[in-house]
Amino acid sequence: MSKKRIYEYAKELNLKSKEIIDELKSMNVEVSNHMQALEEEQIKALDKKFKASQAKDTNKQNTQNNHQKSNNKQNSNDKEKQQSKNNSKPTKKKEQNNKGKQQNKNNKTNKNQKNNKNKKNNKNNKPQNEVEETKEMPSKITYQEGITVGELAEKLNVESAGIIKKLFLLGIMANINQSLDEETLELIADDYGVEIEKEVVVDEEDLSIYFDDETDDSDAIERPAVVTIMGHVDHGKTTLLDSIRNTKVTEGEAGGITQHIGAYQIENSGKKITFLDTPGHAAFTTMRARGAQVTDITILVVAADDGVMPQTIEAINHAKEAEVPTIVAVNKIDKPTANPDRVMQELTEYGLIPEDWGGDTIFVPLSALSGDGIDDLLEMIGLVAEVQELKANPNKQAVGTVIEAELDKSRGPAASLLVQNGTLNVGDAIVVGNTYGRIRAMVNDLGKRIKSAGPSTPVEITGINDVPLAGDRFVVFGDEKQARRIGEARHEASVIQQRQESKNVSLDNLFEQMKQGEMKDLNVIIKGDVQGSVEALAASLMKIDVEGVNVRIIHTAVGAINESDVTLANASNGIIIGFNVRPDAGAKRAAEAENVDMRLHRVIYNVIEEIESAMKGLLDPEFEEQVIGQAEVRQTFKVSKVGTIAGSYVTEGKITRNAGVRVIRDGIVLFEGELDTLKRFKDDAKEVAQGYECGITIEKYNDLKEGDIIEAFEMVEIQR
């Protein structure tokens, strides 16, 4: 007997999956969800329980049907006897018939009308009696969220008016179409003495339900590890992969820097390893932001002659957020200025402590150019993969993740996929993110056409009807019609979702998400002007104690807010706190596009108060800062009794006389205050628009220099 899943077995018996799950639990069988496969012995035990009870119900129904047929036959015989009795009566005389012809005609009409009325009444009465006989109050019912009064009455086999009356006695005015909440539903059911249970609704459009991890699957075999290489620019990521794979990837790319995500598979000591070569860590984060978790091991490449750099720190934070083991590859040890010990010392500050120093992080010194240490690195990858016990079932229909996608001029939409479970075949009907299709051709990482690909294998496919996004999941279906239906439904849902507000956390909606149980950790990224301020702010935020949510600092750094910070905040559903710093142009655009909340402050107390108030639900709708323009200082003039006049050129928006201003130098805020004078030539001006020059003096501030940015802003009252 072939294995069946719980929902398939339930469908055969016209039962709810929940009933099967409850019965299995009563048999002391551990059940994770409705997708779990049933063993042969379990199916036999369930057959005895459910099919036997169904057989009894069928016999009972047949007995009732036979009894009903017998009654119908008796009624028919009675009618025939009555009819023959009426026919045997003698007819009246012709004279009497002629004499009362009109009267008989009228009587006949009245009689027909009376008979028709009686027949109509009989038709109505007969089904009513039958329903009253079969209607019984069930001992238990199941319901879906949002059940109405009418639907509940139908399930309980009672009149809607009875339920409406009970609701009225509870102080609830309702009609037949009123939806009931769980608390009210429990009160009504308890009043009727009926047990209720919420139905588990399975959404086939949710591709995540097909990514089940069945550890008891006897067909599961060991699969290759998926490794991501990350690190600072020019520290040798692609050169390292090139040395491992014995190809010259770097030479064929512009400037020697990786331009796209490459996925490659190599074999070492009889075991395969799949490498994802990401451009820095942006793609890695983008995939994780869409819910994809494809990486098993992260290799952090650090140059021995350069040490820990800003992108190295960001890569460490990304790896920690993804919760995958990290192996540190200390590259360029063959250079005269190499100092591996310094690298290890610097990385201990970020929680990566070498095994030799009592930690649990593997450090491998190597040279990507000469090939020294490559074998040691591959050996360490094999050991870490062995400890993780990575397994997959090649006999299932394939599921996995999109690594990259493009629109090819000759082939149409093409996508690089990583198979995570099952086997992908040419001709399979597939749903990829919000698109679908049938696989027309499949190419491996060597550029060769293949017909099938097993777990942890990267392939490029064609045949889908649109370009998916990196990080989208894919699922193979046995029926092309089903794949089309699900793909179209997902596309429509994505269009609707794009029109709605983003659900990224912000201080404005933080308390609402806490109430709904959606928030347990508030992820925070802190950027400041000096390291001391950043550390002080991080320590202060960690001390905030509000029940139901914790503050988690996921990244801190000195300098202006950049696009990478916004990407990390979006992937981690976090917010960005800027202390005495401003976002650059790219960060502003990215934050607006991804709806990431950025809060800019100059006083630590204000930051703490704002976040604590948001966590307690006390954040009042007051004012929002709106930047109205920027001017660049081109020349300065010092005038006695006046101060420093900044000869400026308005580069963005406009500068108004009543606006607040801040002076920014190299992305760091130096001063915030009010405008003193705004002049156009010798005349006072109310405002100066973009593209015009003006003279600016600032109250109580004269330390203006050429190249400074004067940013004008207004405080606008908003409704939250």
Curated annotation (Swiss-Prot):
Q: Where is this region: G4?
A: 331-334
Cellular component terms (Gene Ontology): cytosol
Instruction: Name one molecular function that GO assigns to this entry.
Output: GTPase activity
As recorded in Swiss-Prot or TrEMBL, the protein's gene is named: infB
The subcellular location is: Cytoplasm
Please indicate if the UniProt record lists Cell inner membrane as a keyword: no
Q: Where does GTP bind?
A: 231-238, 277-281, 331-334
Sorted keywords for this record are:
Cytoplasm, GTP-binding, Initiation factor, Nucleotide-binding, Protein biosynthesis
> Under what name is this protein listed?
Translation initiation factor IF-2
Organism of origin? Staphylococcus epidermidis (strain ATCC 35984 / DSM 28319 / BCRC 17069 / CCUG 31568 / BM 3577 / RP62A)
Basic residues: which segments have biased composition? 114-123
* Region ranges (G1): 231-238
Q: What does the sequence similarity comment in the record state about its family?
A: Belongs to the TRAFAC class translation factor GTPase superfamily. Classic translation factor GTPase family. IF-2 subfamily.
| Role of this protein | One of the essential components for the initiation of protein synthesis. Protects formylmethionyl-tRNA from spontaneous hydrolysis and promotes its binding to the 30S ribosomal subunits. Also involved in the hydrolysis of GTP during the formation of the 70S ribosomal complex.
List the PANTHER family.
Answer: TR-TYPE G DOMAIN-CONTAINING PROTEIN, TRANSLATION INITIATION FACTOR IF-2-RELATED
Region G2, annotated ranges: 256-260
- Residue ranges under compositional bias (Low complexity)? 60-75, 99-113
Does the keyword field hold Protein biosynthesis?
A: yes
Which residue stretches belong to region Disordered? 48-138
